[in-house]
From Swiss-Prot:
Organism: Pan troglodytes
Substrates-to-products reaction catalysed: Selective cleavage of Lys(or Arg)-|-Ile bond in complement subcomponent C1s to form the active form of C1s (EC 3.4.21.42)
Self-association state and partner proteins as the record states: Core component of the complement C1 complex, a calcium-dependent complex composed of 1 molecule of the C1Q subcomplex, 2 molecules of C1R and 2 molecules of C1S. The C1Q subcomplex is composed 18 subunits: 3 chains of C1QA, C1QB, and C1QC trimerize to form 6 collagen-like triple helices connected to six globular ligand-recognition modules. Within the C1 complex, C1R is a dimer of identical chains, each of which is activated by cleavage into two chains, heavy and light, connected by disulfide bonds.
Record's protein name: Complement C1r subcomponent
Places the protein is found: Secreted; Cell surface
Gene coding for it: C1R
Length: 705
């Protein structure tokens, strides 16, 4: 308690007066004229009042009154709560009279009365005595309204709390035990248990007044709500006693238990229910009683446990649960994967990973997936080739194997240096679901055209004079062009045409970039070629050394045409090979020139060819000088034929190739390109030396590949 003190001035009143003191928490009270002698024949009553909720405490600091037997003459009388606390006179420390000493006077209420009385004189043996009177201090002291007052025998001015009393400085308040509600008078309690809520992880719940008889007409609802992921366990204690009937189940009073809104039991009688695992974090206990009965009720202890999920079980032998645990509880998870070569499937969806989490209701948030064998799908088609299964036909799943192959005779598979022949074209369906080769990876092989291997080669034993009509398949690389007139060319690979630059940019003509490029392949007859259709050109590449404006210089007379689309090779359409050494230009080596050019001053409708020997370069040079020609004859050219022969390429054959059979490989090689000459069948013909341009040709073709 904290104490404050306030000085109160001495009050002087005539006999019979009353002096009220304003409500304060502390102060002092004195006799009239203190510390001077007090007057005779005087009586007054001082009323000390403190705020409600406090008591008055009074202590005398000085006390000097005329002593007398029974304090009959002068005295101070103290009263409170309609009771006298004593009558006092004399001096402090003196045995005479009845001095108050250091005694503390305490009221039960917030008022105290102090009456001061003097008689007509203060004489002792004829001598007038002077007495100072008294000085007293008072203070407001907190009243503990909750303390028992039976010891004092006083009546409580306030009604007692029916259940629980709580004191505070200056007052008190009442409350009720669980299951009861404080009434309007703020002191009495009435049973009210319709919405009791418990949120702790464990605790006790009981019927009202347990183990004494519970009140009648109860409608109690005890709700337990704990964190999600916890499950509640209920254990009833002894005694368990709810009014029942021998023949009818719980007709009078009953205890109903609900978990997650579902009834899990209704109980009464004297046998306690079994321990209950509710598998829920929300439980309600409904307790109903009728108007009578004296049963003792019930009490239970509830506890919580983290909810558990069932052990995950795989749906097939290929599913793997990583780090399988003996037990899974709320917020735990597991990861499922598949054995190599299998993939997770959830419904119809392919999963890259799978994780399932244990939910607060004890179920997994996702159903267990299945593992399905990886399917690589239909193998990619191989242009100019095909594949065959080396495992079960049509099965494209994990570990299936296929063998790619090329259409023989016309195509061969591209090989890598150091690769084993047994592994070429072999692809396996991998665990990643892709077809893969050990050397090439995912990239499928290429079927490269086979060059220089005509199915029906020209008969070389026959002596040819003046040219001859070619048969189908003799020169399957032959190309018929119509750009600035008729011309020729040869097929390289399956989409490149080797020809002379001057067929695209003729000498003594203006440079033209928009000329029509008509290219035909696959037959020896012009009309049939037209029926087969023109092959669109994607790109034209002319050697940078070619000069259109220099009419006597055919240096760099070589060009490449890239077809828009690759052609399909066959017996009448095959490429020719490129040279790789100088032996193809040995003196006297026989070669073949074919074309649709002028024959005896007539336009040919069928492919014709001549057989010519490689000539001596010096002889050709001398022959040119004898004709007084200044034409350039460089190391990038060679000549063929003989002045005595009436055989030669002619107008319309330009761009065609000089083809030589390689006796070592039995392949036909394009050693030259028909470039220029002096008239037709009048001596030597001059050809672009292809060997000197092989690097340029390969570079141009590789850039597009």
């Amino acid at each position: 308690m904290w104490l404050l003190y306030l000085l109160v001035p001495a009050l002087f009143c005539r006999a019979g007066g009353s002096i009220p003191i304003p409500q304060k928490l502390f102060g002092e009270v004195t006799s009239p004229l203190f510390p001077k002698p007090y007057p005779n024949n005087f009586e007054t009553t001082t009323v000390i009042t403190v705020p409600t909720g406090y008591r008055v405490k009074l202590v005398f600091q000085q006390f000097d009154l005329e002593p007398s037997e029974g304090c009959f003459y002068d005295y101070v009388k103290i009263s409170a709560d309609k009771k006298s606390l004593g009558r006092f006179c004399g001096q402090l420390g003196s045995p005479l009279g009845n001095p108050p000493g250091k005694k503390e006077f305490m009221s039960q209420g917030n008022k105290m009365l102090l009456t001061f009385h003097t008689d007509f004189s203060n004489e002792e043996n004829g001598t007038i005595m002077f007495y100072k009177g008294f000085l007293a201090y008072y203070q407001a002291v907190d009243l503990d309204e909750c303390a028992s007052r039976s010891k004092s025998g006083e009546e409580d001015p306030q009604p007692q709390c029916q259940h629980l009393c709580h004191n505070y400085v200056g007052g008190y308040f009442c409350s009720c035990r669980p299951g009861y509600e404080l009434q309007k008078d703020r002191h009495s309690c009435q049973a009210e248990c319709s919405s009791e809520l418990y949120t702790e992880a464990s605790g006790y719940i009981s019927s009202l007044e347990y183990p004494r008889s519970y009140p009648p007409d109860l409608r109690c609802n005890y709700s337990i709500r704990v964190e999600r992921g916890l499950t509640l366990h209920l254990k009833f204690l002894e005694p368990f006693d709810i009014d029942d009937h021998q023949q009818v189940h719980c007709p009078y009073d009953q205890l109903q238990i609900y978990a997650n809104g579902k009834n899990i039991g209704e109980f009464c009688g004297k046998q306690r229910p079994p321990d209950l695992d509710t598998s829920s974090n929300a439980v309600d206990l409904l307790f109903f009683t009728d108007e009578s009965g004296d049963s003792r009720g019930w009490k239970l202890r509830y506890t919580t446990e983290i909810i558990k999920c069932p052990q995950p079980k795989t749906l097939d032998e290929f599913t793997i649960i990583q780090n399988l645990q003996p037990q899974y509880q709320f917020r735990d998870y597991f990861i499922a994967t598949c054995k190599q070569g299998y993939q997770l499937i959830e419904g119809k969806q392919v999963l890259h990973s799978f994780t399932a989490v244990c939910q607060d209701d004890g179920t997994w948030h996702r159903a267990m997936p299945r593992c399905k064998i990886k399917d690589c799908g239909q193998p990619r088609n191989l242009p100019n080739g095909d594949f065959r299964y080396t495992t079960t036909m049509g099965v494209n799943t994990y570990k299936a194997r296929i063998q790619y192959y090329c259409h023989e005779t016309y195509y061969k598979m591209q090989t890598r240096a150091g690769s084993r022949e047994s592994e070429q074209g072999v692809y396996t369906c991998t665990a990643q679901g892709i077809w893969k080769n050990e050397q090439k990876g995912e990239k499928i092989p290429r079927c490269l055209p086979v060059c220089g291997k005509p199915v029906n080669p020209v008969e070389q034993r026959q002596r040819i004079i003046g040219g001859q009509k070619a048969k189908m398949g003799n020169f399957p690389w032959q190309v018929f062009t119509n750009i600035h007139g008729r011309g020729g060319g040869a097929l390289l690979g399956d989409r490149w045409i080797l020809t002379a630059a001057h067929t695209l940019y003729p000498k003594e003509h203006e440079a033209q970039s928009n000329a029509s490029l008509d290219v035909f392949l696959g037959h020896t007859n012009v009309e049939e070629l037209m029926k087969l259709g023109n092959h669109p050109i994607r790109r034209v590449s002319v050697h940078p050394d070619y000069r259109q404006d220099e009419s006597y210089n055919f240096e760099g007379d070589i060009a490449l045409l890239e077809l828009e689309n690759s052609v399909t090779l066959g017996p009448n359409l095959l490429p020719i090979c490129l040279p790789d050494n100088e032996t193809f230009y040995d003196l006297g080596l026989m070669g073949y020139v074919s074309g649709f050019g002028v024959m005896e001053e007539k336009i040919a409708h069928d492919l014709r060819f001549v057989r010519l020997p490689v000539a001596n370069p010096q002889a050709c040079e001398n022959w040119l000088r004898g004709k007084n020609r200044m034409d350039v004859f460089s190391q990038n050219m060679f000549c063929a034929g003989h002045p005595s022969l009436k055989q030669d390429a002619c107008q319309g054959d330009s761009g065609g190739v000089f083809a030589v059979r390689d006796p070592n490989t039995d392949r036909w090689v394009a050693t030259g390109i028909v470039s220029w000459g002096i008239g037709c069948s009048r001596g030597y013909g001059f050809y672009t030396k292809v060997l000197n341009y092989v690097d340029w040709i390969k570079k141009e073709m590789e850039e597009e590949d």
